[in-house]
Every structure is written in C-alpha cells, then in structure tokens.
C-alpha cells in the first residue's frame, strides 16, 4: 500500500509482485488525477490573486518546487502535474520531464521552460525558479528538514522573486511554510491534507490535496479482511456487507483489474472548504460500521510503515488504520521503518507463520521481492 510496486526509473508496474497470489492487491490513490488537481489548484489561485502574488511587480510569477523522490511514481506525477498546469513542462519521450531543474533564476534550465498566463488582460511570465529532490545525507527522501533548509538557501539568494511555493507533499510544504513562506506571505501548496497543513490554510497556506486517506486506510485492511473471510474482494467496498459498509465507485475510489489496484480519488482542499477536513483521522461515515465477530473472527496482521517519521503516514494514515482495525476485527502489529533500508523492516518479519495476513509499505518501489521472498 501507499508505494506501488514498480520500476523507479521507468514507472512500469511490477506485475510479478502484484500477482504474488490470488489475494494480493495494491491500495493507494489515483496519482495522476491528484497531480492534475494540485496543478489546477495552483493555477486557479494564481489567476484569482495574480496582482498580489507578483510581490516585486516584475511581471514574472516565480515558483519553487520541492520534489519528494525522483524515482517515486507519485512524486513524478505531482511534478508533472504542476508543470503541465502551469505550462512550464518540457516533453521528454512523450511525458512531461520530471527532472529537478536545480536553480533556474535566469530561465535557462533545459528541463523546464518559461510559460505565460493571461489574467485580466495582463500577461505574466511563469517561471520555475528552482526545484530539487529533498533527500537528506542519510538517503531518506521526502525529507521535511531538507526542504526547510532549501527554502532558506533559495530565499537568501532570490527571495524577492519567489511568489509561490509548491511541494510534492505537506510535510515538506509545511517545513518551507514555517521556515519562510508564512512570514513572507507567500502561498504554499502541498499534498495529503495533513491536519497541520489544513489548519495552516487559515494562516496563508495556499491549499493541499486530500487523497481520501480515510478511504485508503479502510481499503488497505478491507481487502485483507475479505481474503481472510473467503468472501468476494468487493464485499464492503463496491458491494455492501452485512453491516452496511459500502463505498461509491467513481466517487470514492476506482479499481483497475489489470493492475489489481484500488485507487482512492482525490479532492482539492482550499480556503473555500478546509473546515470540512480539519479532522484527518476520522473514519469515513460510509464504512464506519462494526463487523460481526462471529462471521469475521479476530485475525492477526503484520503491517509496516516504511518511515515512522513520515508526517502523513504517522499522523494521518496509521491513526486511521488503528481506527479501522477494531471495526474489522483485526489485531495489527504496526512496524515502523527508518525510511532508508528495507532490511530495517524485513528483519522484524522473522516468523511470518505467526500472522494471517500482511500489508506492505516498501521503502523503495523496486523492492517488493524483499518482502514476497519471505512469504513464499
């Protein structure tokens, strides 16, 4: 879950892992739909506030971009989504190039281009001033502290030109917001709808994307529950279970039979609706009913979180899982990783026979076999 088995260089899905057995599925969110939403959210904000955003009045709306992991499908999709929406993307083999631009104050980088945006009869230049992968010295990606340091470096060098901050996630986004953007009234856009980011919208955070973590967490455990009960995988998902739990396909999620993957659908969270998203750990009303323990008896699940320090996974996703595991009569052992090595996690799966089911959150999307090899 959360990190889809795939080739980190090409994005090609690891079909061997996804077809490990008849009860193997992936649960995540629709990365492309969410990426497009984030990009459009930024464009809409600029159009509505262009005269205020262009802080130095030079006619150039400059943005900086925090990239989470250059080899991660979701990070790639979000970088492409922002560049596509803003018009700054360069074609690379039929896709928008997601390569970090480094520093691009002069607009001469090879992986992005300047774009134009017409607002109320005035034409603005849109420029990606800088972008980099937020990877720390220990190798951990999506690193919030690194993002905070980056905005410090960028703002010291060309701060007056930074009009918008965009991030592949809220952890990095909030780090940059708190370090510089908030005090300088620069709108910052993230992804995940973490509770602190949603609350910060009242203080100038531009917006974020809810990837329906409540639906994702439910699906993560529900597909396991269905397999353990020997019922159709759609039970309690697209088809109501005996308790009345049921999601709406096309509104809450979509399913790809070819990819054996469930994808939660996303929604933009802005100043217009953020108050509806202030509790990120509340279970989804549609799937909040307790299962009958006589029909779905207690089972033991091993579940890892690839990085125990990841803001979204630790403050939103795991609390949701913990709320759902009781409803689904599952006893879950939660294993927190260091965000750097698979062995830090797999070394704690010494006796798989103790468990009835497994939910795997890899450090790197290439490494599904590090786990499946232990389960054969």
Identify what each model region corresponds to.
Residues 1-2, 25-28, 62-66, 163-168, ...:
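Structural recognition of the beta-strand scaffold that forms the well-ordered cores
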Residues 1-33, 54-62, 194-203, 369-376:
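Flexible loop/hinge segments that line or gate small-molecule binding clefts
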Residues 59-62, 66-70, 74, 86, ...:
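Hinge/cleft segment of the Venus flytrap/periplasmic-binding protein
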Residues 67-76, 164-170, 300-327, 331-352, ...:
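Extracytoplasmic "Venus flytrap"
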Residues 82, 108, 113, 118-199, ...:
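Hydrophobic alpha-helical
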């Amino acid at each position: 879950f959360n990190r889809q088995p795939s080739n980190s260089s090409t994005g090609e899905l690891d079909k061997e892992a996804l077809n490990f057995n008849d009860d193997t599925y992936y649960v995540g969110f629709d990365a492309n739909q969410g990426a497009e939403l984030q990009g459009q959210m930024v464009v809409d904000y600029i159009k509505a506030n262009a005269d205020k955003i262009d802080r130095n009045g030079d006619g150039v709306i400059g943005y900086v971009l925090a990239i989470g992991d250059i080899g991660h499908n979701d990070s790639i999709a979000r970088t492409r989504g922002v560049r596509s929406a803003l018009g700054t993307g360069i074609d690379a083999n039929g896709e928008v190039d997601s390569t970090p631009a480094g520093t691009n104050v002069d607009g001469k980088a090879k992986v992005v281009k300047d774009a134009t945006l017409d607002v109320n009869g005035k034409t603005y230049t849109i420029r990606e001033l800088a972008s980099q992968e937020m990877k720390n010295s220990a190798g951990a990606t999506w690193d919030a502290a690194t993002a905070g340091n980056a905005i410090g470096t960028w703002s010291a060098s060309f701060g007056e030109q930074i009009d918008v901050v965009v991030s592949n996630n809220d952890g990095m986004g909030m780090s940059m917001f708190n370090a510089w953007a908030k005090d300088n009234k620069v709108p910052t856009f993230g992804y995940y709808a973490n509770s602190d980011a949603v609350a910060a919208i009242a203080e100038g955070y531009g917006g974020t994307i809810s990837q329906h973590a409540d639906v994702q967490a439910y699906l993560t455990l529900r597909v396991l529950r269905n397999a353990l009960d020997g019922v159709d995988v759609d039970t309690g998902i697209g088809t109501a279970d005996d308790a009345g739990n049921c999601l709406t396909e096309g509104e809450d999620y979509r399913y790809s039979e070819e990819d054996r993957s469930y994808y939660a659908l996303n929604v933009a969270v802005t100043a217009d609706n953020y108050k509806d998203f202030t509790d990120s750990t509340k279970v989804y009303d549609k799937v909040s009913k307790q299962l009958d323990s006589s029909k779905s008896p207690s089972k033991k699940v091993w579940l890892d979180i690839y990085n125990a320090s990841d803001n979204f996974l630790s403050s939103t996703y795991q609390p949701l899982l913990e709320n759902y595991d009781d409803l689904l009569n599952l006893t879950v052992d939660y294993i927190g990783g260091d965000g750097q090595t698979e062995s830090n996690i797999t070394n704690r799966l010494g006796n798989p026979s103790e468990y009835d089911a497994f939910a795997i959150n890899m450090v790197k999307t290439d490494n599904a076999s590090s786990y499946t090899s232990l389960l054969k």
